[in-house]
Amino acid sequence: MPEVLDTYDYLIVGAGPAGCLLANRLSADPANRVLLLEAGGPDNYPWIHIPVGYLYCIGNPRTDWCFDTDEVPGLKGRSLKYPRGKVLGGCSSINGMIYMRGQARDYDQWVAEGNPGWSWRELLPLFRRMEDHFAGTSEMHGAGGEWRVERQRLSWKLLDAFQQAAAQTGIASVEDFNGGDNEGCGYFQVNQRGGVRWNASKGFLRGIAQRANLTVLTHAEVQRVLLEDGRARALSVRWQGRERRFEARREIVLSAGAIGSPCLLQRSGIGPQDLLERLGAGVVHELPGVGGNLQDHLQLRMIYKVDGVPTLNQIAGSLWGKLGMGLRYLASRSGPLSMAPSQLGAFARSDPQQPSANLEYHVQPLSLDRFGEPLHTFPAFTASVCDLRPHSRGTVRIRSLDPGEAPSIQPNYLSDPRDLTVAADAIRLTRRIAAAPALAAFRPQEYKPGPEYRSEEDLQRAAAEIGTTIFHPAGTCRMGQGSQAVVDAQLRVHGIPGLRIADASIMPSLTSGNTCSPVLVIAEKAAQMILAERRREAAPQVLESAMAAGGKEAVEA
């Protein structure tokens, strides 16, 4: 039997963006004892905080789970590296730092699918509450919150020209992607403070380290959720080399992400019956949708060689260039070392019939064959484009009951023919932008996938050959009703009192953009609902105490 260490009001699994925010909000009431558990270590690795350091965090077991997908039929049988944050701050410690809420229609669609309370109008105040926006308070933005948003600290002549070329192609320039309709082209706003990464640990934990009612444990790997009489009561946790048990008086909240949360449920005997029986887990509670509905944004990284303009390829390729970058960052926290992985963004429609922008571009003044490999020696830029609303759906399944064994991750990219059509249209649109007059002075030449891909069939084949994840998995514990839903609109796991999920896994459908800030608003909403429920339950007790006190006074009088 695991050793029982302690009992808390709330147990939170995973100190990624959602877990950090939840720990902050739930522990704001001193009456709540809160335990936050993180499988990774503290966020004290220097490369986490230097923005360009994501290159040294992705694929590094110190900060990354280092997952791989199964072989994906739609990608010519390729398996992809599938990074997920394993460190305090989670993916906010290794991601691209892009601040992106998505589109209003994303959240309104969740409501239309039977999830009241999740509309854009209802979530906007929560986005604003957490924000510390460089522009200050406005109708759309907040100031003084924990989640710092800044302008980037450099621009590139080549990217300015791409923005002009996009305008010449019909994609208007915009200053802010976060007003509910992100269509247009402009520089991304980023989660940085003074040229340093601003992760969820800094934003939501460091300022409250003195709270006596909050405990944060790192290197604590949660093995299983333990039920008693059908209710989630405790967690079995591997910590300091031993299996321990932590108990919850009120609730357990899973914030382990779109991969971690369904795997934890499955190891706990909660999930599809056939999987649980095959692995000998025992069916504690059948929920067929656990681990299904996996969605992700597939990026097509198109590369163009250029002439007559500096790119990071040349700057980082010389000793003097590296020295200059380092000195500039030390002196002013600016220059290439302060760069988010992608600086310029664009949201566009793959065809005029789309109701809103369904493509996102991440444009970079650099190129490489794949993450972890050196930059090319020739000057080039990358125009990465992804389908924001993929129809393909995948799965996440544990391979065994051993928490140390990586799961089966099958994204099933491009398995739906509609996604192949959008991919081909996206390549054609990118070529039109590259051929616009604003870029002509730099003589862009398509290097990847290559001009030889021309027909519809060619372009779909190119997408299968160059497509890769842009690290936005979601949907594996979807919110809603019906047989495939895992949580209700209150984020309560169907059929299991005392257990909620608050992370990207609950999204019924992907948001139209980067997913970190949408995950934060999910956690903000979850905290609001949890605390409201606590107040409702406490109200009768307060009334009873008041009446008892009043009755005593009446007798004494």
What are these regions (language model features)?
Residues 2-8, 124, 130-179, 186-188, ...:
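FAD-dependent oxidoreductase catalytic-site/capping-region signature
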Residues 12, 16-21, 153, 258-259, ...:
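Residue-level detector of alpha-helix initiation sites
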Residues 20-54, 119-122, 260-286, 420-423, ...:
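Classical protein tyrosine phosphatase
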Residues 218-220, 285-287, 481:
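Short loop/edge segments at beta-strand edges and connector loops
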Residues 33, 40-43, 225-228, 234-324:
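Glycine-rich loop(s) and the adjacent beta-strand/alpha-helix scaffold that form part
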Residues 2-128, 287, 297-306:
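N-terminal glycine-rich phosphate/pyrophosphate-binding loop and immediately adjacent elements
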Residues 111-232, 238, 301-323:
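Conserved redox-cofactor binding core of oxidoreductases
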